[in-house]
Amino acid sequence: MLKMVTFFQGFPGQQSVPGTLNFAVSPQKPRSTSEAESETSMSEASSEDLMPSPEAPDGEEESAKKKEKKSKGLANMFSVFTKGKKKKKDQPRLSDLEVQPKPRPELDGPLPTVEELKEALEHGRLEVAWQVLALERQLEAAAAAGGMSNEELVWRQSKVEALYVLLCDQVLGVLRRPLEAAPERLSQALAVVSQEELEDRRASGGPLAAALEATRPRRWLQRWRGVVAEVAAERLDAQPATAPEGRSEAESRFLHMGRTMKEDLEVVVERLKPLFPDEFNVVRTYAESYHYHFASHLCALAQFELCERDTYLLLLWVQNLYPNDILNSPKLAQELQGVGLGSLLPPKQIRLLEAMFLSNEVTSVKQLMARALELESQRWTQDVAPQSLDGHCHSELAIDILQIISQGQTKAENITSDVGMQIKQLLLVELAALLRSYQRAFDEFLEKSKLLRNYRVNIMANINNCLFFWTSVEQKWQISHDSLNRLLEPLKDLKAHGFDTLLQSLFLDLKPLFKKFTQTRWANPVETLEEIITTVSSSLPEFSELQDCFREELMETVHLHLVKEYIIRLCKRRLVLKTAEQQQQLARHILANADAIQGFCTENGSTATWLHRALPMIAEIIRLQDSSAIKIEVATYATWYPDFSKGHLNAILAIKGNLPSSEVRSIRNILDINTGVQEPPRPLFSLIKVT
């Protein structure tokens, strides 16, 4: 299997290109044999060799003289480069120099020999470019005039072409590293390329003599673009510095290429664009070359079997960092607006990588969450006490789980918002599965670890966990209320099971105390209730390590239990009172007990106001003697507690021993009337079984 490291080992002979866009020259290719032969033969010819033969007929001689005069006129233009070679005190800036070529150069005096031009070019004197051009034109004129053999023309043309080879090397050498060139020299190189483009267009206007090889168009502007492409490849392929610890080789490579491209293009915009003629499209040319090489590199990389991290990094660069941090950076955005570089990878490849990323990331999140839950459950079973935070039992499980989820979500959103939306739905599914596993693990702990010393504090720590889960999911995940309830349903069960376990021993202690109501036939209800409240009060400090909201909710559970157990005692049919006075006395006891229960529970945090009417209204039913009044009270009671059934009503009416059976049936039928009230969100009488 191919490895990533193999791909990034670089190519043989590749060297680092330090700095920012210094356009360092790669070793020049050896000249071809034909070029070397042409160069060798140049020493045998002079500019006179390119003129018509002296043995030409008179007419041809006259024509040659006219052309010689014309060539002298061409020298006038070239003098701008030969005069004033000495440096002036105040050398002009490159931006002040004229780089536009003159279409018809004129010369003063005879042309230098080919050997002299060769020597000048070898010394980098670009000003002789115009004289090389003049030789080319003289050759064309000689060929057009006739009188010279084809062999002679071909031989002389080879001399001119050899000079052009030297000139091209010099010009492209300057343009390969434009920031290293003197301003005037760069201006000369640009002017030569522009002039050559003009000559290409001129040559396209008519055919050459049959004996001459077609050497135009030379396409020097296109050659320059090729040089830029080579520079881009050298810069981007350079081996980056040693990868910082924690970064993969691929990550270092991405960072190197991205940073190099951005910095180099900024240099092009700031320093080269003002100097290059518009026809060069210098910003577009460099941008396209860097983009092409960057894209080629990533396309090749995408063919490898990438690890999870490199898949993510590749997408991050293609979809986010490259278009946003490079192409749309403050210095480049406006310049690259019309270039249309496009994406580094084709859409099909991007979709494939995105699918791979989503699969990898969801699998990773699932494994990390499962591991976090496993470690947490091990701490419970090993009887490790939970942490204490602000006086509350604390577990890191919820924080760990939500951080894992959040990191996966953030990574996806860093690629694109669309990928972020895709992974959101997948992560919600995995979170729901994790919460179900959490509930199962917690239930198993409740069942098997009752004898552990830290059993109860670990229960409270897990109940407290629910708060962080609820608030974080509700704030971060914008989902519907129903979806949120379904997602968090396992936590509601976990909390309820935790409450049941924490309160189990208390409720067992209260059971014999509630039995005293019926055992004493409500002879001492005040004292009995005081004993019940004292027992509850002594157990409450333990629950201070719950979060405030859960401590209040726990107290609501206690409140419900007290009211429920009290009603159960009233429904036992053990007490039958035949006089109105006895019934009114019991009603007063019930009211007093109801006030005591309500006051105690409210003082300790219960917000179950829905329970406030449960006992007082039963007391009122017992107190009333008029059948019609009792019916109204029963109907009202049923609207407050829709789960109040005929069985419960029969049990309460059984206390009223002076009520005729016919009236009992009439009162009971009131519950057959549909009041339109829906099932209550909190059950009360459905928790009470009557016989």
UniProtKB/Swiss-Prot annotation:
The keyword DNA repair does not apply. Residues 9-111 are annotated as: Disordered. Residues 91-107 have a biased composition (Basic and acidic residues). Coiled coil: none annotated. GO terms for biological process: angiogenesis; cell differentiation; exocytosis. Residues 33-45 have a biased composition (Low complexity). GO terms for cellular component: exocyst. Residues 12-31 have a biased composition (Polar residues). May play a role as a mediator of inflammation and angiogenesis. Belongs to the SEC6 family. PANTHER family: EXOCYST COMPLEX COMPONENT SEC6-RELATED (PTHR21292), TUMOR NECROSIS FACTOR ALPHA-INDUCED PROTEIN 2 (PTHR21292:SF4). This is Tumor necrosis factor alpha-induced protein 2. It comes from Mus musculus (Mouse).
